């Protein structure tokens, strides 16, 4: 796929999953970390460097063996990376050393974001770690405030919530001997996150917004998509994209945000690498965050929608697997339950179990968040009822894996009309999906559906709409697929308004329009279109036409035999 060698500073679980993605693309990787680190366990190479990613000499050894140098952890020696840019001008380093410098010190990160007009929590430096200085912080920011380590902090380590002045001595003891800063407490209702990919050319691409749930300052769960309105997701996407645009270089970035009670969004922290909140992408998205990072730093193609969910109905929950606090390896019982749960995938990192140590994660994928949560409850032991799938359900799932026809409507009030199309497609054995996509109330969802449909294997779209009936035309404007419009009869004008709206499309945006409320014909037309891809559907259509003809001929013969009066009496 690519002859260049990628050097990775750090061989933990993130490096391990970068290597997994690289292996699929036949990209060679060399790793700098301790012997038998998680990433090295799955990469049999004599070129790996045993050492520390913060040691200048070890970093230089790695640089001599690669064409592109990247990181799986930001706590690396930046001066050495800057020297390498001079010493090895052909060596590409992503993210750029300057970006790593700006981000690895969290207070400098905040100052950079403020300078670029990005909304963040109010912060102040703690020049001297003393009770007096923290009393002054409490006076300026108010209690509670968060005391944070400026560097070398992750997974909740390096944070302490100071609820009142009596807690100051404890905070100083916990965070002693490190540079500190303080943040004003953000009264958030949810913590959100998003993975942002930045290309070599500076283009940015967003993954779905997710919601993270923390326990003991460590990420426990990640819900994808986030359980917030579409409008909030859009604002979060724009905020995160603008933040990443302010940094030089390329790669993937994890952006954590606070969603406040007021509806305001604030950036919490940024990581210049793959992130825990993006692990769900391995199973839920077209491209995982790890492959996306490789595509970015190697300037490989980034096709349209490569960061989107695999299907319009994809929902996911990521559960971190932490070392049990009391019994070593007890967390593996959770993994065993996950293996018995449909739609769940287990990822273990090859790390020795220690209390609260991340040793793996579990991705749970389903067509609804409620179904994801049902599976989560079994995996975590909240319920002992195993999740079973009947033979019929398995067949349904197999049919839904790659739907060929998308049936959409602007409102559930259109479903009685559109259900006839569903019945026809079932009779013809056509796999299809059904959902609600409002052109006016959910425009972003409509756009995402139209743009992603062809990438997901959909061959044609049936769109039902009443009233203004903009849905079929708007979808047709954003997809290369054939769109069949079904005018739905409303309370006014008997559906003629819908018919005129759909049929009168401008040149260049065709919509095949059927009669008012006639989703049956829409489905039959869809089957005919599918015949161009699969001759079995043409055969089924021929059989359908013969059956129609036979039904009419039987009726004609009966009418001719008994006469019209007897025919009407017995009909």
Swiss-Prot record:
Keyword match Iron: no
GO CC, alphabetical: cytoplasm
GO biological process assignments: 'de novo' IMP biosynthetic process; purine nucleobase metabolic process
UniProt pathway: Purine metabolism; IMP biosynthesis via de novo pathway; 5-amino-1-(5-phospho-D-ribosyl)imidazole-4-carboxylate from 5-amino-1-(5-phospho-D-ribosyl)imidazole (carboxylase route): step 1/1
PROSITE patterns linked to this entry: ATP_GRASP
Disulphide-bonded residues: none
Family per similarity comment: In the C-terminal section; belongs to the AIR carboxylase family. Class I subfamily.
Protein name stated in the entry: Phosphoribosylaminoimidazole carboxylase
The organism of origin for this protein: Saccharomyces cerevisiae (strain ATCC 204508 / S288c) (Baker's yeast)
The gene coding this protein: ADE2
